[in-house]
Amino acid sequence: MSSILPFTPPVVKRLLGWKKSAGGSGGAGGGEQNGQEEKWCEKAVKSLVKKLKKTGRLDELEKAITTQNCNTKCVTIPSTCSEIWGLSTPNTIDQWDTTGLYSFSEQTRSLDGRLQVSHRKGLPHVIYCRLWRWPDLHSHHELKAIENCEYAFNLKKDEVCVNPYHYQRVETPVLPPVLVPRHTEILTELPPLDDYTHSIPENTNFPAGIEPQSNYIPETPPPGYISEDGETSDQQLNQSMDTGSPAELSPTTLSPVNHSLDLQPVTYSEPAFWCSIAYYELNQRVGETFHASQPSLTVDGFTDPSNSERFCLGLLSNVNRNATVEMTRRHIGRGVRLYYIGGEVFAECLSDSAIFVQSPNCNQRYGWHPATVCKIPPGCNLKIFNNQEFAALLAQSVNQGFEAVYQLTRMCTIRMSFVKGWGAEYRRQTVTSTPCWIELHLNGPLQWLDKVLTQMGSPSVRCSSMS
């Protein structure tokens, strides 16, 4: 069957006229890629129009797009059951598409709620929000429904609203400055920093008996098992909100003003690269540090040259690599996708094998030991850092002195191993015993810590990796 569309209905042409352009061809081959993108967009719109004609909601979609009005009605399509497309759901993934959407060999609707259009697979509300509002949209984590949307994606109803004006982009919250007293005493040496590298951490599986600690700001979405495309319901969010009191946790209230001190506000600012990633094999650093500038990136085991959205470990060589490391590298596959959205960092396991994460910020949220290693199964994701939680901790630690603030440095470092886990329940008990692992440094929080420590009074001994 030819892939060329024989006829484009006028309504499809009108709707395509409102499509948002991503801008830029991306260099050589951009023309061909743009041509393929245009064809895909036309198929996506044509497919949607066909479904909406049967339900009489097509006029409402056109009204929403042309008026750009959020007060329009819901425009819904069935949210589950591949049978509605008259096609079976493929159970294998043929190819990873560079747009971040799964790629299959035929058009269908899968059981996980994702929509298949011409070799690309994604959540329907994300597809059409990208098409008509935000071409740079990467994930459903970046979207939240407006209050009057009755069929929002997160409500998990039989139908899902694809009205692009019923969704908003998640905004990064503005973190209030931390009020820091200027201390006159200068420390002669740095306090010892908790180091979990050589300790034997506890282990936990995700999901587990997770209950957020009441003295921390609730997650959005709240803690719980998050499937490949899942979010918890608003009811669960309200229950989570009842367990704590965010008003009591704001950095301003955690830093009581003492007018006898010389208090200076220290503000948070976003760096050009939100995180830096180093790759290790056992206890040996391999390759150069990857600096992440994009809100979404993958760390995988393939061999394509790395770009701003992809860190390929398959290209990296190591003369000391043994057979165990070689075998593990072959199983990294699609690896892990990292999102930095709205001041929150998520890790999604794309590999066929689990990933293992040690995130002190995440562990503190759930009341685990700071060194706990959490297993993330394939197709699941976990929030591994939250800027607002960190801001509250920082403001609280300022009142406890230089050492308490300095200890937060460890919270800005996240370790993650591929395929093989480590900890008390595993043969490998330290991260440096795992064949393949990465270490993330969150640059924004680290730079904020540096400014706060400088304001508090820098010690005379310089910080180093050995301190």
Swiss-Prot record:
It comes from the Eukaryota. Keywords: Acetylation, Cytoplasm, Disease variant, DNA-binding, Heterotaxy, Metal-binding, Nucleus, Phosphoprotein, Transcription, Transcription regulation, Ubl conjugation, Zinc. One of its GO terms (cellular component) is protein-containing complex. The modification N6-acetyllysine is found at K19. Phosphorylated on one or several of Thr-220, Ser-245, Ser-250, and Ser-255. In response to TGF-beta, phosphorylated on Ser-465/467 by TGF-beta and activin type 1 receptor kinases. TGF-beta-induced Ser-465/467 phosphorylation declines progressively in a KMT5A-dependent manner. Able to interact with SMURF2 when phosphorylated on Ser-465/467, recruiting other proteins, such as SNON, for degradation. In response to decorin, the naturally occurring inhibitor of TGF-beta signaling, phosphorylated on Ser-240 by CaMK2. In response to TGF-beta, ubiquitinated by NEDD4L; which promotes its degradation. Monoubiquitinated, leading to prevent DNA-binding. Deubiquitination by USP15 alleviates inhibition and promotes activation of TGF-beta target genes. Ubiquitinated by RNF111, leading to its degradation: only SMAD2 proteins that are 'in use' are targeted by RNF111, RNF111 playing a key role in activating SMAD2 and regulating its turnover. Residues 274-467 form the MH2 domain. Changing D300V: In a colorectal cancer sample; somatic mutation. Gene3D superfamilies: 2.60.200.10, SMAD MH1 domain (3.90.520.10). The modification Phosphothreonine is found at T8, T220. Expressed at high levels in skeletal muscle, endothelial cells, heart and placenta. Changing P445H: In a colorectal carcinoma sample. Changing S467D: No change in binding to PPM1A. The modification N-acetylserine is found at S2. Residues 207-217, 233-243 have a biased composition (Polar residues). GO terms for molecular function: chromatin binding; cis-regulatory region sequence-specific DNA binding; co-SMAD binding; disordered domain specific binding; DNA-binding transcription activator activity, RNA polymerase II-specific; DNA-binding transcription factor activity; DNA-binding transcription factor activity, RNA polymerase II-specific; DNA-binding transcription factor binding. Belongs to the dwarfin/SMAD family. Receptor-regulated SMAD (R-SMAD) that is an intracellular signal transducer and transcriptional modulator activated by TGF-beta (transforming growth factor) and activin type 1 receptor kinases. Binds the TRE element in the promoter region of many genes that are regulated by TGF-beta and, on formation of the SMAD2/SMAD4 complex, activates transcription. Promotes TGFB1-mediated transcription of odontoblastic differentiation genes in dental papilla cells. Positively regulates PDPK1 kinase activity by stimulating its dissociation from the 14-3-3 protein YWHAQ which acts as a negative regulator. This is Mothers against decapentaplegic homolog 2. The gene is SMAD2.
